[in-house]
Regions:
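A cross-family phosphate/adenosyl-ligand binding-site feature
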Residues: 3, 13-81, 85-86
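Short beta-strand segments
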Residues: 6, 33-35, 92-95, 126-127, ...
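Glycine/threonine-rich flexible loop motifs
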Residues: 98-107
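Electrostatically charged, flexible surface regions
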Residues: 138-250
């Protein structure tokens, strides 16, 4: 299987290197397209106002390119350049930190996997639920196995699998998970260098669903969720007749 690997932590981050090495060790062909620098929280942004450059880099014998763009740019450009040898899967991560709850909206790891799916290639995002544990081997191995399974069990275009792996030497198992309320918070800022740096604020919505990605991973299980790009809400639209009349009034 040919796997395109990307991330948002940058091409020389340990998580993506572990993921690429795990994919190669499993017998897959690997091509890496990743940002030249840290691009966390870039979400699904793409570059429209300038040229992008993909520069080959030494990567332990694997084919790898450093891109001066966003995580989604990396996948978008990578799939274009590989159009005659199209990957079977876009695998992103391993992210340094969880991508649970509302973090999925901000995540470049999730956004770049989604870009693959929108381009017709199955996408899998992999995240390690710790900023302290730097042993990515287990999460990388599990991510590759999920990618193999995802190719055999494809989702509709515009949907991806998002895997959050709890930190530590052991994982109790795998659970299907909903997207939690984590990271829905009132942001706070601290003064820094004449400006303001965002720090985590007060959570606004407590999580009670034991099947949520937050509580599943806190219980020691890996959480696998299906994420989609279509953000249309399930909430019924209120009657529009009065609003329409107001809008159309001359």
């Amino acid at each position: 299987m040919h796997i395109l690997i990307a991330n948002d932590d940058g091409i020389f981050a340990p998580g993506i290197r572990a993921l690429a090495e795990a994919a190669e060790a499993a017998g897959h062909r690997v091509t890496v397209f990743a940002p030249e620098a840290q691009r966390s929280a870039a979400s699904h942004a793409i570059t429209l106002n300038r040229a992008l450059h993909a520069r080959p880099v030494a990567y332990g014998g694997m084919r790898a390119f450093s891109v001066d763009g966003t995580p989604a740019d990396c996948v978008r450009l990578g799939l274009y350049l590989l159009r005659d040898d199209l990957p079977d899967c876009v695998l992103t991560g391993v992210n340094n930190g969880a991508n649970r709850g509302a973090a999925t909206v901000y995540s470049g790891t999730v956004g770049s996997a989604m870009e693959g799916s929108l381009c017709g290639v199955p996408g899998v995002a992999v995240s390690l639920c710790s900023h302290l544990d730097r042993d990515y081997a287990l999460a990388a191995r599990m991510g590759v196995q999920v990618a193999e399974w995802a190719v055999a069990n494809p989702l509709p275009r515009g949907e991806i699998f998002s895997l959050n792996v709890p930190f530590g030497p052991e994982v109790k198992g795998l659970r299907a998970a909903t997207v939690s309320n984590e990271y829905i918070f009132s942001p706070m800022y601290a003064p820094e260098d004449g400006g303001y740096r965002m720090i985590e604020g007060r959570d606004l919505v407590p999580e009670t669903d034991e099947n949520s990605d937050l509580l599943v991973t806190e219980a020691g299980y890996a959480a696998l969720s299906i994420i989609r790009w279509n953000l249309l809400a399930d909430t019924p639209m209120p009657d529009l007749s009065e609003l329409e009349a107001e809008l159309m009034r001359k």
